């Protein structure tokens, strides 16, 4: 079979930068799915993307589908011929439909009878006749929330389309994509490059770079920007702050990246660096530069989309653009400093948190009380926790945060320090929102933990309390993130906190605001469900999670200890046998009517195997008790694993459901005792 390389390019107007990668990846995934469905073999496929184009390149694509034999089964032989052996109308109609005579049909014998069959050879279709339709279907399935029309066309896409190119090797594939006829012309850079005729699919990247002045390979462009930005920062003795999200966005904004260095007035460094960084990165898409000590330098790196004969002019232009934004930050900072955070408390009464749950002033009052309650249980400074909780949302009323919203918490920390608040209070102002996203760190300072937990629990209990729990994918109050945050803060800091107690206190502080009588139970169930999701994301086996969930431990740190213990137990040689034995014990005990017997009478231990098991349990129990008390579940399960031989022998030699009622009840008591030891940790009968 012959193969050729395929190139498909869609030339558009500027595509949304934050959607560019997803569009390109989806285009490729959709198209390769089409190739697979069409039984077209290929070696590999990659996507390219730049601000004004999407492209895919498929290497060693078969130029035609492989021929194949298709079995076309006809009527059963018993109904294909009459009593005289002549073909029936059914047989003749089937044969005629397949272009053969009945005599040309073969016979297929199965265990259900004998059938007429025709093995038809189906010739593969040429790839070039399939490409346009497959590419169009791939484009139709792209994730485009708001498609648009342009000109007089009824075609819809995320942005207007101007060119379409489909080449299989050197051959132009005829057809249309989004109403645009396939042609060889490829557009270059808007200002620097020239358009050209693409002669062969293999020459796309090279010609586009040389003639068009466009680096179409997204990953190459991204790597070039990162490397050049790092070099530029190093030249001025600093390190560029290159977050991947910003790097992705900048990569999606330029076709021909040129990295340049600019500066701003040093006086702006008197403003907290977070505010300056926010405007440089968020508004201007610049890379800030820091020195070795982590201090912001009066410089920034930016990426132009053109090679200028006068780069100094481009640098001056960017410096001119950023200066007013930095001046705004300076003005807001100096204005905000004139008022303490405490003085802003009354203004929180003007901001509604939620109609039924009150204002932000109501919320910080609850947070303050709950944070102090949590601090008392964890050994943190309750006075600082209460103070931090009370001030926690006051920075939302500052000019800086109103203008640069992502600086909430961070600016609160800076203003708290200027107000003379304790460092614990100031730090809690910033860390109250952690973790902000998946993979973010959690607060570790004791007061910060108390405030962060109080804020999240107040929201969880409040929203559930008014009957607005998340439904489906909708989660307007980010309750799933809040729940994971609660669990992570407690687990990762090993805090001795019980969810039931925390929920009850939060509910108490809401007073009569809550209308849902089942709120506390629903919040607990919601948090327990987050346990499963979180541990699954961490790679913990589902059966391990279910084994622990069966015991419903409501102390997250304790839950985590059990998860780790059961995961370790799974690695022991005896685990599978003991899990199976526990499952057998569970099934036996489940069939017992009435109360389970608990007292073991040593005089009724008739068989050697049951005597040995009882003796082993009696030997282990004094050792297990302190381990359970100290939540040393891993060591407890390791000790219990030594029961394997005794348990195996018991089930080999002993009939549990003996005719003698006393013997039976004694053996049930022995098994109940055995199972209870494991249940101190988890229900290991659920392990697979």
Curated annotation (Swiss-Prot):
GO molecular function, one term: arginine-tRNA ligase activity
Family: Belongs to the class-II aminoacyl-tRNA synthetase family.
Localization in the cell: Cytoplasm
Predominant location: cytoplasm
Enzyme Commission no: 6.1.1.14
GO process annotations (BP): arginyl-tRNA aminoacylation; glycyl-tRNA aminoacylation
GO cellular component: cytosol
Classification via SMART domains: DALR_1
Cytoplasm as UniProt keyword: yes
Assembly information from the UniProt record: Tetramer of two alpha and two beta subunits.
Keyword vocabulary terms for this entry: Aminoacyl-tRNA synthetase, ATP-binding, Cytoplasm, Ligase, Nucleotide-binding, Protein biosynthesis
HAMAP family assigned: Gly_tRNA_synth_beta
Protein name, UniProt field: Glycine--tRNA ligase beta subunit
Classification via Pfam families: DALR_1, tRNA_synt_2f
Record-linked InterPro entries: DALR_anticod-bd, Gly-tRNA-synth_bsu, Gly-tRNA-synth_heterodimer
Catalytic activity as recorded in UniProt: tRNA(Gly) + glycine + ATP = glycyl-tRNA(Gly) + AMP + diphosphate
Gene (UniProt): glyS
Top EC class for this record: ligase
